[in-house]
């Protein structure tokens, strides 16, 4: 449901609705402190909870996947360079200090505007998300 009336007032036709309703989602199982989590990211998503509950893990994974998606679209990185030699975990997740959070039972499904990333059985699969149009190049800010 769309609740931002200022945005609604600026919509000229139904095709403008698409970019507002498209939603980025993140499903996480057995990663760090998270046993199971499903998050739908809206224009502004705020995490509030106890220390050690996994808020930072979610924020770091979201930041990582949006960065990867943007890099793939701009051709600054390739799908092969991300999935080869388990670089997703060993390089990109390690950059966010998440490498030790993964186990053989870890599962992540990130559905972005242009790409779907699925991490399962210690392997990352990347595929195009054909259901969406242009990328909304959002700014991501992680504040611990």
Question: Which sequence ranges carry the predicted segments?
Answer:
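P-loop NTPase switch/coupling surface
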Residues: 1-144
């Amino acid at each position: 449901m769309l609740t931002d009336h200022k945005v609604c007032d600026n919509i000229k036709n139904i095709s403008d609705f698409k970019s507002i309703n498209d939603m980025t989602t993140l499903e996480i199982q057995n990663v760090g402190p998270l046993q199971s989590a499903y998050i739908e990211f809206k224009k502004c998503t705020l995490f509030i909870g106890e220390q050690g509950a996994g808020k930072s893990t979610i924020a770091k994974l979201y930041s990582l996947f949006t960065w990867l998606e943007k890099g793939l679209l701009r051709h600054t990185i390739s799908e092969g360079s991300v999935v080869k030699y388990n670089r997703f975990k060993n390089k990109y997740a390690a950059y966010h200090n998440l490498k030790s959070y993964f186990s053989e039972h870890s599962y992540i499904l990130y559905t972005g505007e242009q790409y779907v990333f699925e991490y399962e059985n210690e392997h990352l699969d990347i595929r195009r998300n054909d259901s969406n149009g242009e990328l909304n190049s959002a700014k991501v800010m992680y504040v611990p």
